[in-house]
Amino acid sequence: MTEAVPISTGGTPVEVKGLTYSYIEGGKPVLTVDSFRIEDGEVALIIGKSGGGKSTLVNCFNGVIPHIFMGSNPTGVVVYGNVVKDTPLPKLSAVVGTLLQDPETQVLNYTVEEEVAFGPENLCLPTEEIRKRVDEAIATTDITSLRDRETYVLSGGELQRVALAAVLAMKPKMLIMDEPTSNIDPEGTARVFETLTGLKGKSTLVIVEHKLERALHFVDRVVLVDQGKVLFDIEKGKLVDHLEELHASGIDVPEHYLWAKRFGLDPQNIDAIRARIVADGLKLEVPPRQNDGKVVMDAFAHVEAQGKTLVDAEISLKEQQILAIMGRNGAGKSTFLKTVMNFLDKELTARSKLVINGVDLSKASIQQRGKYIAYVPQSFDLMLISKTVEEEISYSLRKRGAKDYKEKTEEFLNLFGLKDFRRRDPLMLSVGQRRRVAMASALSSGVKIVMLDEPTSGQDFYHKEIISKELHMLKRLGYSFIIVTHDAKFVYRYSDYLVILDSGKKILEGTPEQVFESSQLYSVVPPTEFYLRNPGIPLPELSRAGV
């Protein structure tokens, strides 16, 4: 029997030399990195297109590659003096903690407290130490109010904070976070980054993130990864000199960086940028809105869990309208969509009414409702049932007897940037790519009312634009959309109507500019101000509703 290899906790957190990896032995490399290094206590931000290799790279640091995803055997990756390919995953997890994009794949236990305690318990720590770590992690992530809650009733954003607490309770030397705020509202995003700011200098942090405006204020380095290669690795202060490269790689450059370059100002000096915008009288153009069509769907939902009201709201959708629903995590946004589709857990009590084009579907089954509404939930992986991307997208087309299903499949593959992945297993793609597969599959059903839960989550700027153009093209063809999102910029640019939910109730509705500028949203917030929020710091007038 081979003697167990002791885990080293000293040395450089990450050192890469001559890394090449492909998911299939002998296949085309998806990652080629000549040299890369992360120093102790650094905060490294890894950015790039969806599917560009960011998650693959960090999975080489935490041992997921090659111990879970086999493929070719990557050499040249050393973490704290441990050769990753030769170090068992349980030993690596003692020094490297990982927060995944999708918290539902990471949260395993029935209650929040049990989940946070699970890791320390597996380290066989004394009971008092476990309690201490649980208390600290729950306090650090500000989830005290969730401590005794069942994990299955939590929103995606709440689950993400629970998953972060569970990782922090392990007290890893290095923390890897793969899109840690993808499902979190702006208020929760700010809380996460406040938590991470408190860890700076105490732990080494590696963050994969699309929300640059939130992360840039506290990172040390920015690493751009595209097509499996490190294109640049620079200090944060030099980022303003690489804006063209960021655009070319599908990165949504923070608004204040664009203004800073235009005015010749320091991008970190938000006050100076705002003052210049006000002095020059610059304003955002208001996009055209489509809100005068006939009502195609009336939906009411009242949902309770253990006597607590989760949702009590009615929303009407008009023909050729893109209606967005925003609000803080736990506001009832996703629960509303699930109620419309009759997808609720048995533990929840619900009353609902659904009328589509004059047809009362209040007592209709999921299957019957599916003939009128296409739905892509947050947990979209449950939709992916086929062996290849091509089969997944063509399934609905073939099922409804479309004679031109091959041509339509090709069209959707092209529209959603999936042509190069047509033969791939959907579940082996990145989160952003899988989400696009699910959306393409839903839209191929031909149903004219579509509900999308967080469609831009995990997407880079390039693919957000693709999704937006596809939605507007379909809107012109008579489609109507309800979109749950935390992406305020997406809402302002592309939606026609906005509903704000808070504690399950509608507190505000109107066009995006009406809502964002309304004093009812706890102060007047001009669109320019809204675009230029101080990175990482929620404005008090926006914090309550989580817009």
Task: Give, region by region, the residue ranges found by the protein language model.
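Conserved ABC ATPase "signature" region
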Residues: 128-146, 403-421
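Conserved ABC ATPase signature
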Residues: 150-154, 158, 425-429
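Catalytic Walker B motif of ABC-type/P-loop ATPase nucleotide-binding domains
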Residues: 175-178, 450-453
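H-loop/switch region of ABC-family ATPase nucleotide-binding domains
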Residues: 209-210, 485-486
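A short, surface-exposed alpha-helical micro-motif characterized by mixed small hydrophobic
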Residues: 215-217, 491-493
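Conserved beta-strand-loop-alpha-helix hinge in the C-terminal portion
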Residues: 229-256, 505-528
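ABC ATPase nucleotide-binding domains
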Residues: 246-298, 521-547
